[in-house]
Amino acid sequence: MKKALFFVGCLVGFSAFAQDNAGYQLPPKNLADLVTAPPTPSVSVDSKGQWMLVSERNTSTTTIAELSQPELRLAGLRINPATSGPSRAVFINNLKLRRVAANATDVQVTGLPTNPQLSTVQWSPDETKVAFTNTTDSKIELYVLDINSAAARKVSDIALNAVLGVPYQWLSDSKSFIIRGIPASRGAAPEISRIPTGPTIQENLGTKAQAATFQDLLKNPSDEKQFEYYATSQAMKLGLDGSLQPIWNVGVIATSSPSPDGKYVLLETIHRPFSYLVTVNRFPSKVDIYETTGTFVKTQIDIPLLENVPWGPDAAPSGQRGHNWRNDAAATLYWVEARDGGDPKKKIAIRDVVLTSDAPFTGEPKEIYAAAFRFGGVTWGNDQTALFSERWYATRKTITKLVNPSSPANPVVLFDRSSEDRYNNPGSPELKKNQYGEYVLDITPTGDIYLTGQGASPEGDRPFVDLFNLATKQTKRLWRSEAPYFERPISILNAEKGLILTSRESQEEQPNYFIRNLNPAQKKGKKPAEPALTQVTFFPHPYPQWKGIQKQQLRYKRSDGVDLTATLLLPPGYKKEDGPLPSFLWAYPAEFKSAAAAGQVSGSPYQFNRISYWTGAAFATMGYAVLENASIPIVGEGDKEPNDTYVEQLVASAKAAIDEGVRLGVVDANRVGVGGHSYGAFMTANLLSNSNLFKAGIARSGAYNRTLTPFGFQNEQRTYWQAPDVYNKMSPFMNADKMKTPLLLIHGEADNNTGTFPIQSERYYNALKGMGATTKLVFLPYESHGYTAKESLLHMLHEMGGWLDKYVKNASAINTNTKTGKMSGEK
């Protein structure tokens, strides 16, 4: 019977290709069902572990009609001009409440608007309420939900402005908000003439201004006017009773953050001159402090236009950056200053310092931390405890130090490791809410903190809960996920009782929430029982018809000895005696500075078999063996740069994956396709140009000509002029004449990802066509870097499946050495 089920998947094929521009097409039902499957609800739990908010969506997709609504693309933003909010949102459509307890039932939230389109959900500081926004056809409104009554209501009719982010923040009293509202004085939108008033001119007077290839930039004075209009808002204090207190005049507000005690507001406002080279986050901005009564306190700094920031992942703007409030103090501002001018090339002992200023902000700032590398963040605990981190990408170094903010002279190193070393990642500290409703370190009376993490190991990911003593640096393991389940901690419900909330899953069991008791009662003289589990949610399997998909975690070696992994997916009912299958390799390369780190195992063999329509996994439903997430490490140890041998390592990694599938008897080396998205598309084109391993390729939303990203790409830090040979060798466009394998190119017509302009696929297709390659280009209208419309996703699967069936599944066999996996004519 199982064998029969397997052959059903194999026999479901694709009809002959439709003519070009024949409209949106549908894939076979096997694939279409993955797109239309009901999405699993998302869950948010209060910090006390008493209530969970269940958010439901009608669908995981949008529609092409929704995507085709008017949209402005300005300053790196995509704006819905009708609502002054972001375009392309996927909304929550229903809310329910549920007790975090056994046998609890969902409580339907009442008072929701008709046809709700909800987002930006936030618990109140005291967690008796939840706020959220609802987006109508013409504006964004604020609602509040009372937990005890499960009733929601609209707080005010005022329209919020979400162009520059979440348009409201709770104040610590849980009775009021700081909002960014649309002022009545904003008036009508500017009329934009189609007749230009003159040329658009940019000029540089001898200064270096290296920048990534940002998209959706301002292009002319008309764009400037529209950006300024739609981003304009007014900061106001809004009470739950609907009362309004203006805090600041009208302007382009990027940040409106209340202090933990609710007495002050940190306002960051953007002002001219705007830029045609960089996005809004680098525009000039002024950082001010106001009282929530509207009284001006101080201008902290006026930050200039940031067009000349040094290049590279270890670079930073010169001067002040990252202004925020200390979570553990009533009203203490902190920020970072670069002592090296933000230039990673400078040799200097201290690169960043962190300074603080206490209310009323009249005294001299206090330096509380000096970083030898780039500041990486801080987790506040109390006036004697904080965890500061530093990072340096060039060496992959990451350091965590224990600091006493009141006496910061002697920080203590807690962890010093490589960011690539997942096996020795200590995890992240658990947090709790303090008297202000802000999250801070959860420190026990004995000076311990709780650490939780993914628990990467040679056995795969095994999430854990540890107790770590800040004084002795000793770790005590409290719990670790055990086979055959993948279980990860969500929150610590009650440390004294040993109760934690977890999400638990297996290959065929959908993730659900459980209460795990780490200290279950035991009878006298008996060994401790397995920690008790209490299931809290019962979300169903999203596609039960594919429960039989088989999954196996593979481990194998590359020819240079680097350890590799992949997840092998096989169709339901498949048996080894059925013989090798047509196969599909789906991957995304990653750079490493250490071969040992590159070979570390990631993922877990016990995670739920989530068959996503987005990756190659979907084609396990169509009779293919899928090598999902095959590791493609690009290693450059010591002074060597990974990309200097990119092509060689790329081909060797792909060959090793195919060889392992052949060794297992499940992969037909004569019928293998390869695919990837974004940098995975770049990988795909390079593999087809530089090897004979594959019968066909599918490249979605990639960049193929690296001379169009001359100031670095992905994790390449060198510019084109520093490493022209590397850029050229890595560019599939430069090797279009070598392409002898069928390649399907798919791209969103409105891709706004840095580097992957749609013209990349257009020009690459033209080059391939000009050189006589077998290729096809599909542009998806209105789609960005990730496709969201149901029509687009279904058509994407139609194209991918048809391409694989024609050029891989039905490819004519050729001789191959199944012992080595080498194909005849391999380069």
Q: Would you name each region that the model predicts?
A:
Residues 287, 333, 414, 513, ...:
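Conserved hydrophobic/aromatic pocket- or pore-lining residues that grip, position, or stack substrates
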Residues 591-593, 626:
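Serine-hydrolase catalytic-loop signature spanning alpha/beta hydrolases and amidase-signature enzymes
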Residues 1-4:
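Positively charged n-region of N-terminal signal peptides that target proteins for export
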Residues 570, 578-590:
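Short beta-strand element of the alpha/beta-hydrolase
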Residues 13-15:
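N-terminal signal peptide c-region/cleavage motif recognized by signal peptidases
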Residues 569, 586-587, 675, 746:
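Short hydrophobic segments within beta-strands
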Residues 18-549, 563, 599-600, 809-827:
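Beta-propeller folds
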Residues 91-96, 100, 600-827:
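Active-site-proximal cap/loop segments of hydrolase catalytic domains
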